[in-house]
Amino acid sequence: MPEYVQLGSRRVGAGEPCLIVAEIGANHNGDLPAALEMVRRAKDAGADVVKFQKRTVELCIPLEQQGEIRTTPWGQMTYLDYRRRLEFGEADYDGIAGLCHSLGMAWITSVWDEPSLQFLLTYDPPWIKIPSACLTDISLLEACRRAGRPVVASTGMSTEDQIKRAVVALGPDRLVLLHCTSTYPCVKEELNL
C-alpha cells in the first residue's frame, strides 16, 4: 500500500494532518433543513468533510424485515417505509452539494449498493466510502474499483480474511482502511488491536 492516499484536496497517511469527517449519516431523519444545519455546525466545529449514507432500501433491507412494524418518530410504520423516509434524493443532495461548495467543504456518502454508487458518481465525489456492513459485497467493491476513485472502507464486524478479500477486490493503490468496532461499548476482546 502507498505511504499516502490523495482524498480530494487532502493527503491521508503518516505525517499528514488528521482529516476530520463529521458523520451525519441518517441523523437528519430525512429532513433537509436539519441536514443543512448539521453541515453548517460541522464546518463551524472544524470538520473537513461531512458524510451521509445512501442506499436503495429495497435492495439493502432483507425481505423478512421489510414488513416489520416499527415505532418511529412519525408513528408506527413498516421498516421499509421508515428507511425510505430517511433517504435523500437528487434534489436533497443538490442542496447539500451546493451548501458544501459554498462553505469550501467536501461531502461524501457511504454507498450501500451499486445504484447508490452510480448516483453518488454523478456528483464527482473526491472518494467513495464503503460502510462496514458492505465490506463483504465483492460485486459492490469491484464496481467501486472500476469507478477509478480512491476508496475509504470501514472494517467493523469483519474477519481478517474478509478484509484481505476486500483489499484484493478494491485494489491497494488508492485504498484507506478504517479499523472500526461495531459494538458500543466495546469489550477489549473485540477491539482487534
Short names for language-model regions:
Residues M1-L193:
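Catalytic cores and adjacent flexible loops of soluble metabolic enzymes
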